[in-house]
Amino acid sequence: MWIRDARPDEADALTALVLRSKAHWGYDAAFLATCRDELTISPEELTARRIVVAEDDTAVLGVTSLEGRPPDGVLGLLFVEPSAIGGGIGRTLYAHVLDTARELGFKRLTIDSDPHAEPFYRALGARPAPAGEGPLPRLEVTLTPRADWAQAWTGGRRAVHLGNVAEFQGQFGEVTQEARRAAGHYASLAAFASPHPAALVLPRPVPGEWTALVARQLGWGQVEVYEELTGPDVLTRPALVRHLRGLGLPFVPWGHTDASGELSGRGLPPGALRYESKRASHTLFRRLAPDHPGIAVPEQWTPATRREAARLIAARARSGTATVVKSEHGAGGSGTRVLKRRARARSLPRGPLLLEEYVAGDGTPSDPTYDGLVDGDGQVHDVGVAAMDVADTAYQGATVGPGAVPEELAAHALRFGRAVGRELAATGYRGWYDVDFVTGPGGRLAPTEINLRLTGPSAAFMAKLRLDETRGGDHLVRSLDRVPLGARLPETELIAFLRELTERCAGIDAVLIPSIPTAGYEPDPYVGVLVAARTAGRLDAAEALVRAASTDLAGLFG
């Protein structure tokens, strides 16, 4: 489905659609006759009323209008073909109106709602307006300004997303076949590389109905999907390159590579990715820490050999202290282990090896993370602080939104994360980054690594911004990147399961957004999702529902 401007030659057909939609709610012919003049669309007014339609390959499915001049406007029409009601068309059109209104500088919209439509608008954040004349419920929508970071990220526009996870990782060492396969699944998160994609370029096929399901939840318009393509693959297809560049939209890669720089025309200078190294980032942390009383940097050692590392680990184990063993590069906890006893040298990873003081997270949350970005001019923008879910050393997901991280802890992370961003900007880095922490004794934050790319928490921040803008309120969003399934599900059954889950979550006033839909038929099947709600209780209930339903598949298909 896509949205376009209405054409003069379809004014009569759109009027007929509006009247059919109105009649759907049980109004008789006599009543509709009294409404006809008000609901008639004339060819001459299409532009002035900013009338647009939603259509698929076969028919126009809905129509809406944004009327008036900034700062105060009116949502004049929003009608959906009766056979398409309940399919997310109205929500997508409503989101389009809000997007357009923000772009044009509107601050408020009023809606004279049909009584039957009032619950729809109320669920999307509209509230009763001050009493006014007229027989219809009058609602009002306050359009909050777009977040500073979102404006800096894509100029507030849609974007072309490149899921180049394995390519990015391959810049720092060999990517095994197993890791490449996992990265292919994880690359689905590139759908959330900005709040509203126009096109996705992904390294593996995704279920055909997945993007439509996500679009329905987030009010996206039509999204072009190009599968089984890496950045270098795209560059070998001149027609595709011309098309993507011809969209005139920002390119957003998962991480910067030579290929993504060539596609976007915005490459990075040599050395701009240096702080992706855990050794280099630790050096930076120690340099910055004296100006940040809330930060305590763990000790780090760089043994020359695995044998030397084993001796140091054993000595620390004898004194009752654990040691973190890190590879210099690695994502999501890969290449990182916590050892509480001695280890044989041959069991340790090859290559550059780092040993680090183990900090047992004893705060709430135990693993916060700061997300920010450096814009094209080198200015740093805070995105926020998330509470990560980390099992042992493996990243599982993150929660963003009100109350996810206590204010004092968040303030320390924001200040330090901002300082890191300024150092990144000085190296020539431009783009998204995060700083991961462990909450140590006394609530002091121990920084552990920098990621110079998009991350799991970034997907939660993008979804939160989109939900807040299109549904109102201040959402909590939780990313669950690996929810085990009780049975392997082929694509058709997986989409049916996810569709049912979205409806069940809606029934408890929560939102479910499938984020990783490609691993349902793996030997150890799983799915990734984002869940959202306006309260912590509903968010927890939604997660519990998703996990229980996923486990229960064993009884249905096992």
Please identify what each model-predicted range represents:
Residues 5-77, 81-83, 94-95:
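Acetyl-CoA-dependent GNAT
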Residues 179-193, 200-311:
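Conserved N-proximal alpha/beta basic substrate-recognition cap immediately N-terminal to
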Residues 86-99:
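Conserved acetyl-CoA-binding loop-helix of GNAT-fold acetyltransferases
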Residues 295-298, 320-325, 338-364, 556:
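Conserved ATP-binding module of the ATP-grasp superfamily
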Residues 361, 369-421, 451-479:
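ATP-dependent carboxylate/phosphate-activation module, predominantly the ATP-grasp catalytic core
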Residues 395-442, 486-507:
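A long amphipathic alpha-helix within ATP-dependent nucleotide-binding catalytic cores
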Residues 468-558:
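Peripheral (often C-terminal) accessory segments that flank ATP-dependent C-N-forming ligase machineries
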Residues 101-114:
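Conserved GNAT acetyl-CoA-binding A-motif
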